[in-house]
């Protein structure tokens, strides 16, 4: 998932409210686990591709969201393939055997990762960080009754989302500077690699603390006193488009249950 980046657009998902998109993403998670056979996975795969295509986002951004968990997907695939020993033997070479159930589970688990990361990436790329945090604050509003500091939580999320791309860019600059000095972060034993990371972390932490201090000073100078009396440039309103998005999710769930053999 790509966090802190927003690509403006005019697609259906772009024009839906952030509240509806967050509800859609959270409710999509349990639906993924309904896909346990070929029919449900083919349908969910087609739905995910349709969502990606209709968002009109450059495919490189979606692939960028998948890249951080690519190792996890491959690792999970191999683990399921090697340690699930049920069903007919599909391939055998000495001690190495691939079982039918192992291959089935490996494909299903890998696809689940793909579905989840693709949809959450779509939500974050089609929603600006400020809209995302305002929506979270709105969804947390009922918890104000039990004195949960919803505005402060939303503010922390907003600042985190704002500075994650900045810190990532800063990390890349420091890495290039270290490599220019002859530091190789990808070679040698693990102990040496960890030792090579220390010169990378220290300037990164110093930069992060300096940015935090500058931000706190700027907020104080502008008279920030919490969420009391705060107004917003754009108020989030529930529209028929948002209702359509949730109804689409309900239809998806019912169809998955049917294809799974639940009716």
From Swiss-Prot:
Organism name: Exiguobacterium sibiricum (strain DSM 17290 / CCUG 55495 / CIP 109462 / JCM 13490 / 255-15)
Subcellular localization(s) per the UniProt record: Cell membrane
Name this polypeptide is given: Energy-coupling factor transporter transmembrane protein EcfT
GO molecular function terms noted in the UniProt entry: transmembrane transporter activity
Transmembrane domains' residue ranges: 22-42, 69-89, 105-125, 243-263
Family membership: Belongs to the energy-coupling factor EcfT family.
Keywords: Cell membrane, Membrane, Transmembrane, Transmembrane helix, Transport
PANTHER family assigned to the protein according to its UniProt record, in alphabetical order: PROTEIN ABCI12, CHLOROPLASTIC
């Amino acid at each position: 998932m790509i966090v802190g980046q927003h690509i403006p657009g005019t697609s259906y998902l772009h024009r839906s409210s952030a509240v509806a998109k967050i509800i859609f993403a959270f409710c999509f998670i349990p639906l993924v686990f309904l896909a346990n056979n070929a029919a449900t996975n083919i349908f969910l795969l087609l739905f995910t591709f349709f969502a990606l295509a209709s968002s009109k986002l450059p495919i490189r951004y979606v692939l960028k969201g998948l890249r951080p968990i690519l190792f996890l997907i491959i690792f999970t695939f191999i683990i399921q393939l090697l340690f699930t020993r049920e069903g007919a033997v599909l391939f055998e070479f000495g001690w190495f055997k691939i079982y039918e159930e192992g291959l089935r589970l490996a494909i299903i688990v890998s696809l689940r990762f793909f579905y989840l990361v693709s949809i959450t990436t779509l939500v974050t790329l089609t929603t600006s960080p400020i809209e995302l945090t305002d929506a979270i604050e709105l969804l947390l509003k009922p918890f104000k009754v039990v004195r949960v500091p919803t505005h402060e939580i939303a503010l922390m999320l907003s600042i985190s989302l704002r500075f994650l791309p900045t810190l990532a860019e800063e990390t890349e600059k420091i890495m290039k500077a270290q490599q220019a000095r002859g530091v190789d972060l990808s070679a040698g034993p693990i102990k040496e690699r960890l030792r090579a990371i220390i010169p990378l972390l220290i300037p990164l932490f110093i930069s992060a603390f300096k940015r935090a201090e500058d931000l706190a000073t700027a907020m104080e100078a502008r008279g920030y006193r919490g969420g009391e009396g705060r107004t917003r440039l754009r108020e989030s309103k529930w529209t028929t488009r948002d209702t359509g998005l949730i109804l689409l999710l309900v239809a998806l769930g019912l169809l998955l249950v049917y294809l799974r053999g639940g009716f």
